Amino acid sequence: MLRDRPSPTDPAVLALQALAHVAGDDAMGPRFLALTGMDADALRAKAGKPETLIALLDYLMANEHDLVATAEAIGVTPEQLAMAARKLGPDMGGNDW
């Protein structure tokens, strides 16, 4: 039986791609860690958890420059990341913009 592959526009997939970009960025990575109170090991351990993805999208929604830079880096529009935040947010306890 073939398993369904997640769509590249799936909100969790977009959030994971954004997280990978932010974590690897010299400016955004440390700032995100400082705001969440996590260290790099904790982030690695919690990377796929809904609350971590929501925290990352909340972080990006609060900083337009980082939102635009991240969207460009992962090949999506800022609006697609905002939509991912809206889709993950209400169901998982995040913001509903």
List the predicted regions and their residue ranges.
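Metal- and O2-centered redox machinery and metal/ROS homeostasis
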Residues: 1-97
